[in-house]
Each structure stands twice: as C-alpha cells, then as structure tokens.
Amino acid sequence: MTGIGGFGDRGEERSTLRLPTLSVLYHPDLRRIGARAFLSELAIGREVLVSRNEPELALPDQLVGRPLEDNHVSRKPFRLRSTGDGGIELLLGDSRTGVVADGVSVLQEHRFAPREVERGVVLELAGRVVLLLHVTTPPKETPPRFGLIGDNPALLRVRAEIQRIADLEVPVLLRGETGTGKELAARAIHDAGPRRSAPFLGINLGAIPPSLSSSELFGAVRGAFTGSVTAQEGYFRRAHGGTLFLDEIGETPPEVQVMLLRALETGEIFPVGSQSPLRADVRVVAATDSDLEAKVRDGGFRAPLLHRLSGYEIWMPPLRERRDDIARLLLHFLRQELARIDEGTRLDPAAPSCDPAWLPPRLVARLARYDWPGNVRQLRNVARQLVIGSRGLPRLEIGPQVERLLRIEAPRPVAADLQPAAETPSSPPPALGAIRWRKPSEVGEEELFTALRDHRWDLKATALALGISRTSLYALVDENPRIRKASDLSAEEIESCFQEQGGDLEAMVERLEVSKKALGRRLREMKLA
C-alpha cells in the first residue's frame, strides 16, 4: 500500500505508515542530537517548510519539540515536497541557508530519488546543523533501552524482543553482521532476566584453537593433557546459575558440537578426561554472523544443534540501516574516550568548559554518509582514533587513517534482491549465500593487503569483503611474505608495543598490523592480558 506522497508500507502485511522524517545529527546544543520531526504533511501531498523556526523537532522521550533556533539558519524557509513516488524535492527559494546534501551544495533545487530517501540524505545547514532526511515508522511504544543507544525502528524491535524473552529460559540465537552489538544484546538479556545476579560469561569460539575448545567449554580433569597438573573448570561450570554467551557459534568444531548439543539437552557436561557428568545450569545465548543454514547443508554444522540454539532468534540490524542513530552513538563513544584522557567535559553540556565546536559538523555529516562495514564496533574504533589523534588540541582533527577510511566506498555484500530490507523480524538481512564469491587466484597481493588493512586485520570481515572463504584467506596470508601473523612476532616486539600503546589492544593491532584475536592470544600466553 502506498500513501498519497508515495510513502507507505513495505509489503501488504504491514499496516503502519512510514513517514518522511528529519532527524538531528548535529546541533550546537548537543542535547538536541537525536531530535526528530515526522513530516506527515509530505505523506499527504503537502509541502514542509524548513527554517530557523520550523518544523519542531522532539527527542524520542519528549512530547513537545522545538525548532532549530540556530541564528545561522535563515528565518526564510526552504521547502520540501513529495514527488509522488517516494522521492522528495528540495527547493531553496528565497532561503539564505546554505544547504549541502550528501556532500554536494544545493544551488536552487534538488530531487532526491526514492532510493536516496530510503538510504537517508544527509543535509548540512549553514555549516552549523546536520539533519538526516529519511523515511521511518513513528513508534507505537518505547521498550526499555537495556543500555542500547538509538531509537531507529530496527533497534526498537530488538529492544522489544529482548523485553519479550528476557524472563524465559529458552536459548537465544543472535544473528547479524559482525560488530552490530550482539554481545551487548546478550548482556541485556541476562541483566533483564531472573539470572541477573549470577555470572555472565562470554567466550569467542572463533578465537580458540579447535584442540582446546572442549576443555575451555567443559573443563578438564587433572592429567587429561600432557603437562596439565591442575583441573580446569571450564566456562559451563564457571557460568553455573547464570548466562553463557557463545560468540561465533558457527566456528564450533564438529566434535565439540556433539558435546554442546548434549549439554543443552540434558544440562550435563563431561569434563575432558572424566567419565562422570556434572550439572551445568546455564542459559545459553549464542551469536553468529555466519549462514548457519548453509553450513548445515554443507555438513559443517549439525542441524539438531541449530534447532536447539535457536529457541528464539533476534536479528541485529547493521549500522547503515540505523543511519539516524550514528550521531548519538558517535557522541557516546567520543565522551567515553575523552573521559579516559581526562578531557570528559569537552562534550558535556552540563560542564562550563563544554565546547561543541570541538566536534566539527562536517565530520559528523561525513561519518553519517559512510556505510560502516564494521558496524558499531568500527564506529567506536574511529571515535577512539579521533580522540587520541586530537589529544590536547583545541579542535578535533581527522588523522590520515580516518581520512583514508572515509574516502573508501564501503564494501558490501552483493545481494540478489537490492530492495531495502524491511524493518521487521520477518525480513532478515540478505543471507551470506547471496554474496558473489570469487576464486582466491583472482585476489592480487595489493588488493589482499589493502582489504586486510581496511578491515583492521579482521580475517572474517576481510574474507567477506573479498568474496572468498576464510580458509582461502588463510592460505593467501600464508603464501604472502609481506603479511605477518601474530605468531611471527617476537615476544620483545609485542612487549615493546604493549608498553608504547599502554596496553590498548586496538592501537596495537594498528601498529603491528596483525589479527586482533591472534594478538590477544599471544598477549594471554605472555600473561600481558
């Protein structure tokens, strides 16, 4: 169904009207970031005027809004009007407000195609205010936040699902791209449930050598391995009574899958080397960015285990589909990093020394236009780089690494269906099976090195971007003497870098150019972490 202005439901099963919306991405009053105005007039064929004094924009938890009220934005409005097919026209008219749309100055008028509006158009007004023109669904209710930042409908859906299943004992499978916040969602499920006072433990199954997976999960008796002089408790026993978060569940070795299935079905585990079962009362929340159904078809993952893990599934939205949340997330991460270097008052509106100009509006606009293949995790890392690179300076400065990042078009999976994904659980992100795969021989040395660097030496993200399997990527890395592995680094080099970077693992990854997971293992082996 489509409204008069061309803005309607995505699919006949939906009854909620989606409306054109203006959301504040940057305002000199930092408290205004996240405010929005639903432009219902456009949906019924009327024009919307945008000026210093209109429309009124309200924060998600407020009923009454305020206009922009910035003296650099003209009182004379520019106009927005529907093109009738889901597109929107911007007409400057007599407005003296300088408008930049997606990085291009608007001289008189500009038409935004339906696909641009769906993606979100970043509007910079007078170099002072940044707005996002997009289409979204006004919320009918607001679920608890659970520590998750943002009010995009896709995130509201996640929050509602967490509220729905938190007090139940069913296993939960969190699905979605890497870096979308699956561990935060897992912790929210734990904190909102009856096990909140018990342990919450997480283990990344992709970061553990297959030979150690069994003992890490289920423990081991003394003498189970050569050189093992003490018993090992294992994550299931350590999380007894609480919640166990199994990240990258798709990387579980086949022999461990059998043991994991038994633990889920019976609540009993067998430590390695033991013939006697132990009780393990845990709630399991698993996470993956893999296509587990494809792994089942290929024999790499057991169907019964998938069925047992997915008592309830929650899809985590990618950041590019939450463009209206980017500025609030950025502000949150910047404040966190500033606090770490004792400059926390820079962006605190309650502090007399608050300096909103330290954060340039144009930078916020550029970050909002980027597609974030690494999602929220990548945005957090960029915030850290920005703060450290601008430490002690009067204004935030963009270093060469961030500048290079923003000039690169984000690599995205090429899906067969290019229509925007619906904001409902029934329409999950495109399966990884839709990616256009390549032969490893098609990947050149320079392309390989650039992809690794652009994805911060994350092998899974790099393999996905290159369109090859992770096994093929490992082989290419092994064949290329230019690329070092964490195992190639000497203890002296690692210890020296550890001291230089103050133990910051992210900074060490940038400096040493190796996988974060593998470097973390080396640090643990050296008892530095």
Residue map of PLM features:
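Forkhead-associated
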Residues: L42-G120
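Nucleotide-binding/hydrolysis machinery
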Residues: R195-A198, G273-R283, D291-L418, R453-R456
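Bacterial C-terminal helix-turn-helix
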Residues: M1-E12, T16, R36, D102-S105, ...
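Conserved post-Walker A coupling segment in P-loop NTPases
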Residues: G147, E161-T226, R237-P253, P318-R323, ...
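Conserved catalytic/switch belt of AAA+ P-loop NTPases
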Residues: R222, V256-R279, S290-A294
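Intrinsically disordered, low-complexity acidic Ser/Thr-rich regulatory segments
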Residues: M1-N71
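Dynamic helix-loop-helix/coil hinge segments at AAA+ ATPase domain boundaries and subdomain interfaces
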Residues: T136-A160, S211
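Structural recognition of the conserved hydrophobic beta-strand(s) that form the central parallel beta-sheet
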Residues: F245-L246, V282-T288
